[in-house]
Structure formats: structure tokens, C-alpha cells
A protein has these predicted regions:
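Divalent-cation-assisted or electrostatically stabilized phosphate/pyrophosphate-binding catalytic cores
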Residues: 106-128, 170-184, 207, 211, ...
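Inter-helical turn/loop segments and adjacent helix faces that build the functional surface
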Residues: 70-75, 135-147, 162-179, 191-209, ...
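Mid-bilayer segments of alpha-helical transmembrane spans in multi-pass integral membrane proteins
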Residues: 119, 151, 155-159
């Protein structure tokens, strides 16, 4: 357990360094997300505003901004738009995930489904995904559109696979890794690869960053699941054992 906590601390330290390096752009990502989530339906506005107030590290958005920076992307604000897009995919999966798991608490606060019910939460999650795809089409890069579309499909398949094996105490390591690779690591991998695509880097750099993102995502989820297995609600911010 101590090793996992140390690993989480190392990730948090690296996160702080990354955030500091792109902090100005992250502010613009937040503004872009708020703008894109604006709706003519008052309940949608109410629910998305609540979700934004619950916070979040914006880690996947930071990975897109960070990789775009190290790949020397400097033309316009496409990195900001696509970082917002990646974050919207993540937010939508959380909303759907909370409904599936019947979660009442996330980040120490009530989930959308515990306040507004399952139907509204699912539809608002779908709304986020539709806004995300709208942004991808506006960006106009088919490679990015294909990457994030296939990633969204992979996340859904990972969630279904997890449901299929939920509660299995004797789950094979291979099955567990397949689940977290799809539902978590795939979006980390996409977030890091997008930055290199924006900068028109050669395939070996794209593949290297994608590989890095995937392994970071696996590490993150393994640490998160270990804490889920052996932690306390007041420290973890959500119901313990929900992912098992």
C-alpha cells in the first residue's frame, strides 16, 4: 500500500510541474469548455455548471497541451480546442460511469445522477460527447477525428467488458489489464498522441508518445484501483470498492 501511495505522490508532483508549464493555456481550455457546454435548455446548463464546479485535475487536457508544447506546436489555438475536446470525452465517461456504478459521491461531492437521476445524467453525458465531436469536425483533421472516435468506442467497450466481469474475485490479470487499457489508458494514449499530430511529427514520435500515454494511464488506473480497494472515503473522495 505504501508503494502505491508513493507512486500516487510522484504522479501528483509530475502533474504539478506539467500544470505550471501550460497554466495559461489551461485557463483558456476551461473557458472553451464553458463556452461549448452552453445550452438553450436550462437543465443542461445547470447540470454542466455543477459538474464543472466539482473540479478535477484536467490531467488529460494537460497531456495534450504538454505534448503539443514539447513537439513545438505554435500555430493558433488548436491545442486548446482539442485539449477541451479530450476533457469532454473524459467528463462524459464519468457521468455514464456513475450511472452504471450507481455512484452517489465523486470528488467528495454528490454525483449528477444522485441529484438529477439516471436519465438526465446519461443524456447530458451524450450532450458532452456530441459537443466534442462537433469540435473535432471544426478542427478538420481526419487523423485526430479517427483517433478520438475510435478511442471513444474503445472506452465504451472497456466499460462493457468491466460490467461483464464485475465482482469476479478470480479475474485473470490479462482480463483486468484489457479492461483498464480500454476504459482508462486509451484516452491517456490519445491525449498524448494528439499533441504530436498537431505538430505534424513523424510516426515514430507519435507512436512513442502514444506508448507513453498508454503506460501512464495503466499506472494511474492500477494505483487508483489499489486505493479503491484499501482506502477511506474522506481521503479517496468516492465510494470505496465501487470499481470491484
Amino acid at each position: 500500500m505504501g508503494t502505491v501511495v508513493q507512486l500516487k505522490n510522484r504522479i501528483n508532483n509530475s502533474y504539478s510541474e506539467l500544470k505550471n508549464s501550460v497554466e495559461e493555456k489551461l485557463v483558456l481550455v476551461e473557458e472553451k469548455i464553458k463556452l461549448k457546454l452552453s445550452s438553450k435548455v436550462s437543465l443542461v446548463d445547470e447540470m454542466t455548471s455543477y459538474h464543472l464546479r466539482t473540479g478535477g485535475k484536467r490531467l488529460r487536457a494537460l497531456l495534450t497541451l504538454g505534448t503539443a508544447k514539447i513537439c513545438e506546436y505554435s500555430k493558433g489555438g488548436r491545442d486548446i480546442n482539442l485539449a477541451a475536446c479530450v476533457e469532454l470525452i473524459h467528463a462524459a465517461t464519468l457521468m455514464h460511469d456513475d450511472v452504471i456504478d450507481k455512484s452517489k459521491i465523486r470528488r467528495g461531492k454528490k454525483t449528477l445522477n444522485s441529484i438529477w437521476g439516471n436519465q438526465s445524467s446519461i443524456l447530458v453525458g451524450d450532450y458532452l460527447l456530441s459537443r466534442c465531436f462537433e469540435m473535432m469536425v471544426e478542427d478538420g483533421n481526419l487523423e485526430i477525428l479517427k483517433l478520438l472516435s475510435s478511442t471513444s468506442a474503445e472506452i465504451s467497450q472497456g466499460e462493457v467488458l468491466q460490467l461483464q466481469h464485475k465482482g469476479e474475485i478470480d479475474m485473470l490479470e490479462e482480463t483486468y489489464l484489457k479492461i483498464i487499457s480500454a476504459k482508462t489508458a486509451s484516452l491517456f494514449a490519445a491525449a498524448t498522441k494528439v499533441g504530436s499530430i498537431l505538430a505534424n511529427k513523424e510516426n515514430k514520435i507519435k507512436e512513442a508518445l502514444e506508448f507513453y500515454g498508454k503506460n501512464l494511464g495503466l499506472t494511474f488506473q492500477i494505483a487508483d484501483d489499489t486505493l479503491d480497494y484499501n482506502s477511506e472515503l474522506k481521503f479517496f473522495g468516492k465510494k470505496i470498492g465501487n470499481d470491484f
